[in-house]
């Protein structure tokens, strides 16, 4: 019996570590895909494919996701416009570290929107993350470029999305995949409308295999497999182990960006990234502890 439980624990940990690795690699993959097609077209294809694959989830009780999914999809549209444009304009390493700030920002957004005061330790995590951003963006020679600013905006919007998801889905039985389907449809439709309204519209679909391999990787692995693996593993691993494994995502992002794209972070950049990771791990470990009053597990799916 103990051997079986240990095997299940290792399997759960392996799945969570795989998800962190996939999500960490997604920044470099997206950066490469954007070499072949503009942001709006790339997002329209990526989320259009996700919507088509998840469409069966909207049958029966899945339709309950329509009402909350539409406004949440609009927020998600803003997130990915900022995030994907940010990935294009900054390094994949910076993008991976900066977007993880949403974990630290979320408790303070809950304080603002849901009137839930954060744990005192989270103020320390916030200070660590701010120091990390300062080091990551140049330290004394602060050079926050447009891409970094867009990634920070995306992190802030992700925190807003978490709070809105909890508020709009509280007390409702809504399938996570159905909610992701609606949100993906809204993002795809929004990008198509924005794209065709611009002068010249969207260019012809790219023919480069690298674009399609990258896009399919993001759809099949960064969204569908990641959701399956995360849902299957979360109930089998301890909160501390989950926090440590999922908090490794930005580290994987920086390593993959270095190996694949040739990006190099200096000592100051690595110090800043590690401070952000430390703040993220602190927030995750505190956030997973039982509390007398919670808003429920309404965090939106990563797409």
Mark where each language-model region is:
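Hydrophobic/aromatic residues within transmembrane alpha-helices
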Residues: 33, 42, 86, 91, ...
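Helix-helix packing/entry segments at the starts of transmembrane helices
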Residues: 43-45, 81, 95-101, 164-188, ...
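Hydrophobic transmembrane alpha-helices of multi-pass small-molecule transport proteins
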Residues: 54, 70, 76, 118-138, ...
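C-terminal transmembrane-helix exit sites in multi-pass transporters
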Residues: 53-61, 83, 102-124, 251-271
């Amino acid at each position: 019996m103990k051997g079986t439980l240990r095997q299940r624990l290792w399997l759960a940990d392996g799945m969570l570590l795989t998800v962190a690795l996939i999500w960490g690699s997604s920044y470099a993959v997206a950066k490469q895909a954007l070499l072949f097609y503009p942001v709006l077209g790339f997002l329209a294809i990526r989320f259009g494919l996700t919507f088509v694959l998840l469409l069966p989830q909207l049958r029966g009780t899945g339709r309950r996701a329509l009402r909350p999914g539409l406004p949440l999809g609009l927020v998600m549209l803003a997130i990915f416009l900022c995030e994907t444009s940010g990935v294009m304009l900054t390094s994949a390493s910076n993008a991976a570290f900066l977007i993880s700030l949403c974990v630290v920002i979320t408790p303070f957004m809950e304080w603002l929107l849901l009137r839930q005061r954060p744990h005192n330790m989270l103020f320390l995590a916030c200070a660590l993350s701010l120091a990390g951003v300062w080091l990551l963006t140049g330290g004394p020679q602060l050079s926050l470029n447009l891409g970094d600013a867009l990634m920070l905006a995306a992190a802030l919007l992700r925190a807003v999305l978490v709070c809105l998801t909890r508020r709009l889905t509280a007390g409702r039985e809504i399938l996570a995949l159905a909610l992701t389907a609606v949100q993906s449809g809204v993002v795809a439709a929004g990008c198509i409308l924005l794209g065709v309204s611009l002068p010249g519209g969207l260019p012809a679909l790219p023919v480069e295999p690298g674009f399609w391999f990258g896009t399919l990787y993001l759809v099949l692995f960064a969204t569908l497999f990641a959701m399956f693996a995360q849902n299957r593993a979360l109930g089998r691993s301890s909160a501390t182990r989950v926090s440590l494994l999922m908090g490794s995502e930005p580290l994987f992002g920086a390593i993959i960006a270095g190996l694949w794209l040739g990006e190099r972070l200096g000592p100051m950049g690595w110090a800043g990234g590690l401070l952000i990771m430390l703040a993220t791990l602190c927030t995750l470990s505190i956030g997973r502890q039982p509390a007398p009053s919670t808003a429920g597990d309404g965090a939106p799916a990563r797409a």
